[in-house]
């Protein structure tokens, strides 16, 4: 359960919803009157991400943007809102190296809570401070959740050691079973 101390959530989906792809950049940034943007942040982040702020009022559709540009404009908008808790779904997909480095730096330094899903081991090792590992076990029939207060490198090492021990234990059990059956 999410703590009640979080009042404002922001979410960056892995893919932009189809209805939003039809929007112009102008409509995406300024068309939704319910979204309160901090324009100082918006223009500062645009400069940091080397995004030409003149394009904010462009009629260019989101569908015409490259994957990296699309992710960048979503980051610009979301990070310019007032959020307590940020959810990111595969935030490093399609990003160029400069933007990825910027994102890692932002995530390392933000005082706010960010939860992200990623298969990018580099991003995980540079940024993650707590791991929530979701997996399907027993022939993908049973869900298991592991929560560890470790960075990714230590979690990965711990997982490998646990796996090696499980293999060793299974081998020992099999040998003991075979000995018992041979009698």
Where do the PLM segments sit?
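ABC ATP-binding cassette signature C-motif
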Residues: 1-166
């Amino acid at each position: 359960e999410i703590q009640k101390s979080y009042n404002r959530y922001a979410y960056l989906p892995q893919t932009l919803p189809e209805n939003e792809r039809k929007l112009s950049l102008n409509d995406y940034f300024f068309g939704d009157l319910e979204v309160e943007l901090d324009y100082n942040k918006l223009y500062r982040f645009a400069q940091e991400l080397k995004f030409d702020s003149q394009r904010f009022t462009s009629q260019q559709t989101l569908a015409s943007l490259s994957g990296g540009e699309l992710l960048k404009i979503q980051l610009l908008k979301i990070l310019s809102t007032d959020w307590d808790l940020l959810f990111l779904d595969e935030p490093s997909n399609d990003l160029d190296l400069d933007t990825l480095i910027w994102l890692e730096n932002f995530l390392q330094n933000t005082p706010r809570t960010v939860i992200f899903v990623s298969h990018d081991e580099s991003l995980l090792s540079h940024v993650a401070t707590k791991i929530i590992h979701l997996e399907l076990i027993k022939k993908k029939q049973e869900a298991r959740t592991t929560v560890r207060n470790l960075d990714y490198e230590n979690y990965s090492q711990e997982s490998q050691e646990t796996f090696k021990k499980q293999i060793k234990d299974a081998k020992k059990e099999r040998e003991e079973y075979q000995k018992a059956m041979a009698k």
